């Protein structure tokens, strides 16, 4: 698979006005290039814009050609009509019906990042029918996300090319899982793309659902211009213009430096990188990096003179969008003027689909797997960041092992144990130095919104004892993102454990539900 070539600048209609956009850029990039750059208005009247940058938070939802889509996940195309006024209704009509028999495969792989691509390539020589699904426009996952501002590394290019060499691998990009199709145990998932929805039946399943950012609330975090650190990276790759803009990046973990590097390459002025960990913890971590020379070299290459330890965000302020950031330092406070603020407080595994299917978790909150990557549910395997945060090298080894095991090649899977142990040691080394310190868990004020979808403030949650109680009384976690942002935040802040989803993983269109009901012989009437 060759990387798409971006040539002519497509013309789109944005809120009824014609606009030329950069080739290959996302709709979120087009929104950011205009003034104002917000994509929607919240339930309490606040302006909002792209936040997570990777299809998790749903803040950037807009109407595209009459259908509700996520701006950060959709590439601009010639003649596309984008509308930020969400009161419009979806045009009538039911999606084309799929033949259930034609949508059956031997092996279904969810997620086409490093783990998913490696799993597909390991399983492909067996001749089994493989379907590889990803909600991005091209394979690569978040780490190798494509776009006009992306630089795709050689390992990603090789994996993409190898995928095209197997006729038994069907790649479905721009496609997401919205839930289970049928009853539990029927081995079918509900898939949906921009045009239609269908039930995808499978024999074995490999979950390579990756991870998402932990995004903690603080005063001003809902202002347009505030994003996640990984969200900033994703938006840069999608073509969001940053040249000459002043950026502050805050939070914890190696992702801060990676985001700063991406922003600098895009022409931004990164004026501060605030890492909450202290220098002693980072020094201990750096001392261990000699065991992984490539990681040590990467750390040196990403060094930035504006990096500060024992520093964290306190508040973002501005008129209609972020204009200033107040930071806590070891020796006091500082206020910095900026155009954008990117905050990331680490990564959390994407486990919801596995939980919905009955898979149990391990002690660190990832999907529990055995020595061949099988979860606690027979026939369901997992690989990559959904089993714990550990980097793309670990993900590729796990994916390869899962691919072999899923088609019965257990001897080949067992041979990878030593390789995996080396990268698992690196994953274990990541946990301690970047553990969140207590001050970051008390940044929110009573009026700070915890649930961005339903505009639920911290004060509304204070009287509740657990996640279910809070949902019932405040609608926290019941908006478009289905608790992916506020659920993880509430778990960090209050120790609440969100319950696994029951049947639906994400909001689904009526035509998708109708098509699946029809294919199963049921009716929505």
Set out the residue ranges of the language-model regions.
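FAD-binding core/adjacent interface of flavoenzyme oxidoreductases
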Residues: 45, 66-107, 145, 156, ...
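A conserved FAD-binding loop/helix module that cradles the flavin
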Residues: 383-418
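A Rossmann-like FAD-binding core segment of flavoenzymes
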Residues: 160-193, 200, 264-352, 363
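Beta1-alpha1 glycine-rich phosphate/pyrophosphate-binding loop at the start
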Residues: 105-162, 244, 249-250, 254-290, ...
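Non-heme iron-sulfur electron-transfer modules
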Residues: 37-51, 55, 63-94, 138, ...
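C-terminal catalytic lobe of FAD-dependent flavoproteins
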Residues: 308-364, 426-494
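FAD-site-proximal beta/loop scaffold in flavoenzymes
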Residues: 227-236, 340-390
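Local cysteine-cluster metal-coordination motifs and their immediate loop/turn environment
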Residues: 26-28, 32, 40-76, 447-461, ...
């Amino acid at each position: 698979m060759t990387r798409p070539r971006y040539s002519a600048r497509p013309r789109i209609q944005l809120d009824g006005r014609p606009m030329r956009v950069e080739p290959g850029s996302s709709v979120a990039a087009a929104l950011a290039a205009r003034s104002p750059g917000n994509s929607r208005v919240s339930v309490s009247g606040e302006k909002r814009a792209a936040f997570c940058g990777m299809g998790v938070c749903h803040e950037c939802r807009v109407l595209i050609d009459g259908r509700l889509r996520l701006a950060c996940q959709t590439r601009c195309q010639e003649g596309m009509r984008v509308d930020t006024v969400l009161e419009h209704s979806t045009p009538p009509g039911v999606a084309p019906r799929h033949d259930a028999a034609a949508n059956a495969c031997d092996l279904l792989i969810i997620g086409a990042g490093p783990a998913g691509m490696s799993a597909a390539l390991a399983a492909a020589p067996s001749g089994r029918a493989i379907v590889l699904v990803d909600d991005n426009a091209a394979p690569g996952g978040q780490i190798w996300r494509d776009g006009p501002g992306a630089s795709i590394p050689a390992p990603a290019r090789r994996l993409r090319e190898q995928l095209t060499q197997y006729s038994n691998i069907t790649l479905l990009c721009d496609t997401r899982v919205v839930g289970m199709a049928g009853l539990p145990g029927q081995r079918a998932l509900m898939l949906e793309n921009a045009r239609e929805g269908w039930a995808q039946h499978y024999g074995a399943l490999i979950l390579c659902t990756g991870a998402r950012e932990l995004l903690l609330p603080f005063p001003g975090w809902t202002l347009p211009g505030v994003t996640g650190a990984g969200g900033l990276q994703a938006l840069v790759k999608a073509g969001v213009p940053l040249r000459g803009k002043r950026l502050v990046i805050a939070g914890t973990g190696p992702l801060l430096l990676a985001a700063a590097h991406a922003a600098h390459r895009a022409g931004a002025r990164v004026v501060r990188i605030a890492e909450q960990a202290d220098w002693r913890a980072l020094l201990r971590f750096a001392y261990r990096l000699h065991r992984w020379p490539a990681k040590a070299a990467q750390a040196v290459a990403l060094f930035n003179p504006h990096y500060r330890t024992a520093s964290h965000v306190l508040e973002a302020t501005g008129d209609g969008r972020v204009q200033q950031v107040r930071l806590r330092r070891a020796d006091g406070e500082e206020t910095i003027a900026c155009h954008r603020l990117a905050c990331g407080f680490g990564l959390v595994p994407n486990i919801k689909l596995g939980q919905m299917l009955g898979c149990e978790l391990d002690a660190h909150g990832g999907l529990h797997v055995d020595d061949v990557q099988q979860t606690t549910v027979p026939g369901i395997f997992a690989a990559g960041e959904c089993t714990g945060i550990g980097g793309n090298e670990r993900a590729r080894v796990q994916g390869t092992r899962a691919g072999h095991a899923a088609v019965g090649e257990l001897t080949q899977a067992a041979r990878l144990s030593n390789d995996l142990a080396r990268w698992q040691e690196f994953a274990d080394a990541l946990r301690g130095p970047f553990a969140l310190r207590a001050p970051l868990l008390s940044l929110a004020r009573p009026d700070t919104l915890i649930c961005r979808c339903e505009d639920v403030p911290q004060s509304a949650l204070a009287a509740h004892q657990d996640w279910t109680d809070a949902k019932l009384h405040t609608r926290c976690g019941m908006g478009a993102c289905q608790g992916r942002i506020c659920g993880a935040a509430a778990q960090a802040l209050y120790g609440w454990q969100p319950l696994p989803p029951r049947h639906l993983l994400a909001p689904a269109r009526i035509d998708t539900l109708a098509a699946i009901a029809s294919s199963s012989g049921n009716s929505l009437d």
